[in-house]
Design a protein with these regions (language model features):
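Acidic, glycine-rich A-domain
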Residues: 6-205
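Short, small-residue-biased leader/transition segments that mark boundaries at the very start
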Residues: 1-5
Length: 205
């Protein structure tokens, strides 16, 4: 199992998400199931080095992503829970969470999971909004990041090698993902996470 975080969650939502993933990782480890907890954001608010390089090159049209990505491994699959639990404190660190480029983060998480030797692989996405990066969207079509996300989801679901599940917090993720659950209250997250995993394992049996 692998959890993927989203940039926009702040305050209570990100705190609850961190606690839920911490408990889930500990529980799965006791069941001898390996898990990863991953996160993603950008290094800067206004594009960083990517945008500066684009400007120096004369601002060519349709440049694609114009921000520097930051992908974070809070817990790797082979790292024991006790060694990784302190890393989740990074989620609460002021200033670390900025913009969010969902598609490339999902592709990164998928690629990490695809290299694993386990027979059963589940990728869980926790999301609270559509992809947003002002630097990128200001010089590309308005649906650029959303289209990228849809394309990557489509590729993953078509391959059917990894089970992809999305949980939306106040955000309808069913318009992106085939297997999706939307909750309106972040306090429901822990229960929904466990229910989704239980249902998935039950179907396997």
């Amino acid at each position: 199992a692998s959890d993927v975080y989203k940039r926009q969650m702040r305050g209570r939502p990100i705190t609850v998400a961190a606690l839920c993933s911490d408990i889930l990782a500990k529980t799965l480890e006791r069941c001898l199931i390996k898990s990863e907890i991953l996160g993603f954001t950008t290094k800067a608010w206004k594009g960083g080095n990517s945008r500066e390089k684009w400007i120096k090159n004369g601002k060519p049209s349709n440049p694609g992503r114009l921000n520097d990505l930051r992908h974070i491994i809070y817990k790797s699959a082979d790292s024991p829970w006790r060694r990784s639990k302190k890393n989740l404190g990074l989620l609460l660190k002021e200033g670390i969470l900025k913009e969010n480029v969902d598609g490339e983060a999902l592709s990164w998480a998928y690629n990490r999971l695809s290299f694993r030797k386990e027979k059963r692989k589940i990728l869980i996405v926790i999301s609270d909004g559509a992809p947003v990066d002002d630097s990128t969207l200001s010089v590309n079509p308005g649906n650029y990041l959303e289209k990228n996300l849809r394309d990557i989801i489509g590729e993953i679901e078509k391959k059917d090698e990894i089970e992809l599940i999305a949980i939306g917090i106040g955000h309808d993720v069913s318009r992106y993902y085939s297997k999706a659950v939307t909750i309106m209250d972040v306090d429901q997250l822990g229960e929904v996470l466990l229910n989704q995993l239980s249902a998935t394992f039950h179907l396997d049996n």
